[in-house]
Amino acid sequence: MAYIYLIGKNLTKNFTRDEYSRANRKTDGRIKIYPETFVFMTALQLFRDQIGKPMYVNCWFRTKAFNKRCGGIEKSNHLRGCAMDWYFKGENMADEKKFIQYAQKWKDIINIINCTDLFGDIQGEAGMYKGFWHFGIQNYSKSFYHWDSRSGKQINMPFKELR
């Protein structure tokens, strides 16, 4: 793990360090970035370029303490900066067709990154919640992993279009 100091506020063209670290930054301005975080940031920027509209970040990197407070799972990809909860302003985030459409774009981007063979075998993940979506990268599954948690209970792999 490395600590880096950034000049300016952006991690990528469209994502800022404030979005990345919200409430988790050290008081001296340091942020925790893992090697796989760079892969995730690259994938996010490719996704953002493809969709052509702003993504509003609820949560990206989490410390263990913050993750516990907000009810995150023990091995959350947020702990490595490899997951982001986000939404589109003014859009219905409960629309399954839109979720599937955007999750498929995310899946395609991760597949392209895997074709480069630079980062090992990673898989994408996408979750649907009330009011926001979760996108991430992971290596615990051999395929794109997705879920629906809008009811408050997680239903794994519910969308046949994403299998």
Where are these regions (language model features)?
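Amphipathic alpha-helical interface surfaces
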Residues: 40-43, 66, 82, 95, ...
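N-terminal start-of-chain detector that recognizes signal peptides
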Residues: 28-29, 55-61, 105-109
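Catalytic cores and adjacent binding grooves of peptidoglycan-active enzymes
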Residues: 75, 80, 88-163
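Extended, low-complexity, intrinsically disordered C-terminal regulatory tails
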Residues: 42-71
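Solvent-exposed, flexible loop/coil residues
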Residues: 19, 65, 70, 74, ...
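Extracytoplasmic cell-surface/polysaccharide-interacting catalytic and binding patches
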Residues: 1-48, 130, 138-142, 146-163
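Short connector loops at helix/strand junctions that flank enzyme active sites
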Residues: 50-52, 79-83
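A broad, low-specificity signal marking well-ordered, structured residues that form hydrophobic/aromatic
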Residues: 55, 84, 133
